[in-house]
Each structure stands twice: as structure tokens, then as C-alpha cells.
Regions:
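Alpha/propeptide regions of enzymes that mature by internal proteolysis
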Residues: 1-366
Length: 366
């Protein structure tokens, strides 16, 4: 179930055909999911991977930028993006304690895949949120096998949402969270560009939850919360990946990443000290950036670029905010009930219950 299937149309923009990050040409998404008992412990975790282009990211770099709304989180590879403005690897999302293992596995995959003697370093982007309530996070069950599976199955088309990949054990606004996606396509007179969002949602308090601007969370307090006896509501994080085919430069990608904060705020998130809210945006509009291989001596001294004029960038900002907002609602509607190891229920938010809560707040529908 997704927001639009319930008649919840967020914002003014129009989604792409998949209403997902994969509406940006060349972008692919893959998941590897662990949902089983291992050595007597419940394991619910995995890896979600975004390939920014149809070819190898190192050979076809993208301009990129990042933004941190609240820094109680971790991510590898972002310092070089801040410095050089280039995304040269796939982007992986996993749980907090598996960042290093996923990074190492991506490095090994890169070396084996390219096999170029000129390739001498790789700094993959790996992002995380904490799934320790529903997953044996200390067991560090994610490794090279899961990374390989996510790479192998990365594809365009509809994106699987909810309890899948890195989002398998996540909690959002005290409901079952996980992976979500949405997109917006600008009209031709605004460039026809697409902005897509993919999120891993593990954040937010229920009482703060808003959908289409209406405070539905206050109408959902009778549904059990996994934090009623232990833990702090809102503890957790949200990771956002934004993709666009607009010809943005790195500083413009950073500006786009900042607008993810608006989508998070519209749904009632973004105010928790314990949340790691890390956002990355990349742009595929410049197709011929030189390969990111500093051992080569035959690269040109300069490369012609295209840039979207800032006078025309505001519709992209609006599209990014709307896509993130809708992706969060899609996460909530894609959930399934789960229980913690000690028996606490992490409930899914059912579509009919969300609609009832919306109507109670005076939501008119559209």
C-alpha cells in the first residue's frame, strides 16, 4: 500500500511512472534482506544499495553534495564529496554496526569488477540507521554476501519498500519503518527534470506525525508503542538519498540535499537530539565527467559542463521536499507488524486507520 493508492496526494507536483528514485534514468536500487533467527537471536537487517548510473560509478562519476540536519549518525565517503563534489561509488545503506563491513565489501567488489592497475583507492559511501530494537545488531550479520546480493539485483523499475534491505528492522514514528521512495517530474516548461528520493526511515515521535499537513499522530495514540516501557520515542535516524537528471553542479547538489529537511519536517520529524539525519543528493545531468582515476595521465585539463541557472532551481527544491515527504508516508504504509526479542509490538500503520485519523483531523481529501 502506498499513499496515492489511498487517495493521499501530497504536494502539487506530479510523480514519475514508478513514483520512485528509479524514475531518474540510469538509477538502480537493490536490496539484500536478512529476516531469520541465527544462533538463537532474531536477525532483521540487510543492505539497500543505489547505483547512480547505468555503468560503473567510478568510470561515470556524478556531481554530488550532502547535508547533515542532525549529526548523531555515521557515513563513510562524505568528506571527499564535500571536498571534490564527486560521487564515484554506489551508495549503500545498512545498520549502524555494519557500516565498516559494507564499506570493505564494496571496496573488494570494486577492485574485482574493474581490474584496472590504475585503480588504487576507493572510498565508498555507506550510510546507516540503528535497528537494535528489532535486530541482533551486535551480531554484525551483514557482510560481503549481502553486499554482493544487493549489487547483483540492483535494477530500475518499482522500488520495494518497507521491511526490506537496510530498512528491515527500522522503526518510524513508533510504527514499523524501513525503506521508502517517491519522485516528482517537473513540467516541460520548467525543464522536465526528475527528482527522486529513497529513504531509510528510523526516526520520529508518533505524537508529532503529520500527513498532508494534518496532525494524525495525535489520533493514533491508542495503538501500542514499542517505546511505552523502554527507550525514548524518536530515537533513531533518517537517511535520504536524492537523485536528479538536472545538470546541477556540486554546490547546487548540496542545496538540493538541504531541502530534504523540509520533507522530514512536514511529516513531523527533524527535532530529535538522538537522530542522525544525513542527506545526500547527486545529479546525472552532466554525462561526460572524467573517470575518477588519479593514476591516469591522459585526462584532459578541462571538461565542458552544463549548469542549471539558479533562477530556475526553485522547482527542483520543491520537488525534493515533496518526494521526501511522500517517501516517509510510503514507508509507514508498507510496514508489517513485528515484535522485539522481549515481545514488544512494533505495529504497522494500516491504511484504513490512517485515513480514519486524517478524517478526524478535518482532512478534506483531494
Amino acid at each position: 500500500m502506498r499513499a496515492r493508492q489511498l487517495g493521499i496526494t501530497l504536494g502539487l507536483g506530479t510523480p514519475g511512472p514508478f513514483n520512485a528514485i528509479t524514475d531518474v534514468p540510469g538509477v538502480r536500487v537493490g536490496h539484500s534482506t536478512l529476516n531469520q533467527r541465527i544462533d538463537g537471536r532474531q536477525v532483521r537487517t540487510g543492505v539497500t544499495l543505489v547505483q547512480p548510473r547505468a555503468g560503473a560509478a567510478r568510470l561515470q562519476p556524478c556531481f554530488a553534495g550532502c547535508h547533515v540536519l542532525n549529526g548523531n549518525g555515521d557515513a563513510t565517503g562524505l568528506e571527499w564529496i564535500r571536498e571534490a563534489g564527486l560521487l564515484t561509488t554506489p551508495i549503500a545503506i545498512t545498520n549502524t554496526h555494519s557500516v565498516g563491513a559494507v564499506r570493505d565489501a564494496l571496496i573488494a567488489e570494486e577492485r574485482a569488477e574493474l581490474g584496472d592497475s590504475g585503480l588504487y583507492w576507493c572510498m565508498p559511501v555507506v550510510m546507516e540507521t540503528f535497528d537494535g530494537l528489532l535486530n541482533d545488531i551486535w551480531g554484525q550479520h551483514v557482510g560481503a554476501r549481502q553486499v554482493g546480493e544487493a549489487l547483483a539485483c540492483a535494477e530500475s523499475g518499482p522500488v520495494r519498500e518497507g521491511s526490506v534491505g537496510g530498512g528491515t528492522g527500522m522503526i518510524c514514528h513508533e510504527f514499523k519503518g524501513g525503506i521508502g521512495s517517491a519522485s516528482r517530474r517537473l513540467p516541460a516548461e520548467q525543464g522536465g527534470w526528475t527528482v527522486g528520493a529513497l529513504i531509510q526511515a528510523n526516526h520520529g515521535q508518533r505524537r508529532e506525525l503529520r500527513v498532508d499537513g494534518y496532525p494524525v499522530g495525535r489520533r493514533l495514540g491508542d495503538i501500542p508503542s514499542p517505546f511505552s516501557e523502554e527507550g525514548t520515542p524518536g530515537m533513531g535516524s533518517i537517511v535520504v538519498i536524492l537523485a536528479t537528471d538536472a545538470p546541477l553542479l556540486p554546490h547546487q547538489c548540496q542545496r538540493l540535499a538541504q531541502r530534504a529537511s523540509i520533507g522530514v519536517a512536514r511529516t513531523g520529524g527533524g527535532t530529535e537530539d538522538s537522530s542522525g539525519d544525513v542527506f545526500l543528493a547527486f545529479a546525472t545531468g552532466n554525462q561526460d565527467l572524467p573517470p575518477a582515476d588519479y593514476a591516469r595521465k591522459d585526462l584532459p585539463q578541462s571538461t565542458p559542463l552544463r549548469m542549471l541557472n539558479n533562477d530556475h532551481i526553485s522547482p527542483l527544491f520543491a520537488a525534493a521536499a515533496e518526494a521526501v515527504e511522500e517517501a516517509i508516508v510510503n514507508v509507514l504504509l508498507a510496514g508489517e507488524d513485528m515484535r522485539t526479542e522481549d515481545g514488544r509490538l512494533v505495529p504497522a500503520l494500516k491504511g484504513e486507520r490512517l485515513l480514519a485519523a486524517l478524517r478526524e483531523t478535518g482532512w478534506p481529501g483531494r
